[in-house]
Design a protein with these regions (language model features):
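N-terminal intrinsically disordered/low-complexity leader segments
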Residues: 1-26, 215-221
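Amphipathic alpha-helical linker/stalk segments
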Residues: 19-20, 79-105
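Helix-turn-helix
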Residues: 20, 31, 39-74, 78
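Generic hydrophobic, amphipathic alpha-helix propensity
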Residues: 28-36, 53, 75, 79-87, ...
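Amphipathic alpha-helical packing segments from all-alpha helical-bundle domains
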Residues: 85-88, 92, 126, 135-163, ...
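Hydrophobic alpha-helical connector segments
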Residues: 92-119, 173-176
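Amphipathic alpha-helical segments used for helix-helix packing
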Residues: 104, 116-140, 185-188
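Amphipathic C-terminal alpha-helical segment
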Residues: 114-119, 159, 166, 173-194, ...
Length: 221
């Protein structure tokens, strides 16, 4: 029996995750990456320098450069990849036990909304990737890897739609991503778990409305 579209999408994410071994990352490097993401998400990417990062960590510049010889550019690249792989791994954990396509879609959306609303680093990731399309400050290899992850993420949604019998277009999927990526801006989260759960449910309802509005015809018609 052939794997379902969802199973194929999940398998592609597992293959993507297997390409990098983050277990080998030293505690010192992880600490620097976490601090960079936190500072950049709070104060803005341009406000973070090797000096401000060192001050945040209580480290001298030589200690930072011993972990990241190429300086801030290397830290930016590795922090983006580290966040990407963490997001992908946690997303896979959140959806892979879903019993049906509808539940899988809902799990995708709930995770996406929760990340965007409660994790400032997710908004930073979107900002840096969007800014790179204009300014081109990320390296080509990094740009391609991030774009590849975006395509895998979109394919998870496409797979769910296909199993629900909906012939979805890429334009519709991108419209849904625009909605979900902007969750921090339309949610007005009050910081409580109950409100976050309500917001994720709302995200599911909005995404299904967009999905159905953008569907050309039922796949089985």
């Amino acid at each position: 029996m052939s794997p379902s579209p969802r199973e194929q999408a999940n398998a592609a994410v597992r293959e993507f995750l297997a390409k990098r071994d983050w277990a080998a990352q030293t505690p010192a490097r992880k600490r620097i990456l976490v601090a960079f993401l936190r500072l950049a998400a709070t104060n803005g990417y341009n406000s973070v320098s090797m000096r401000t990062l060192g001050r945040e960590l209580g480290l001298k510049a030589p200690s930072l450069y011993s972990s990241f010889p190429k300086g801030k550019d290397q830290i930016v690249a590795e922090s983006l990849l580290w966040f990407t792989h963490g997001f992908a791994r946690d997303l896979l954990d959140a959806v892979q036990e879903s019993p049906c396509a509808g539940d899988y879609w809902a799990a995708l959306v709930r995770f996406h909304v929760a990340q965007q609303v409660s994790t400032p680093e997710a908004d930073l990731w979107n900002l840096l990737v969007a800014s790179d399309k204009v300014a081109g400050f990320l390296g080509q290899e990094l740009r391609e890897e991030l774009a590849f992850w975006q395509s895998l993420h979109e394919e998870m949604y496409t797979a769910a739609a296909e199993e629900m019998g909906l012939a979805v277009t890429r334009q519709t999927i991108q419209a849904i991503f625009t909605l979900l990526d902007g969750a921090a801006h339309w949610s007005a989260w009050d910081g409580t778990v109950a409100h976050l759960e309500s917001l994720t449910d709302y995200g599911v309802a909005l995404s299904r409305s967009l999905l159905e509005a953008g569907t050309r015809t039922p796949a089985g018609a």
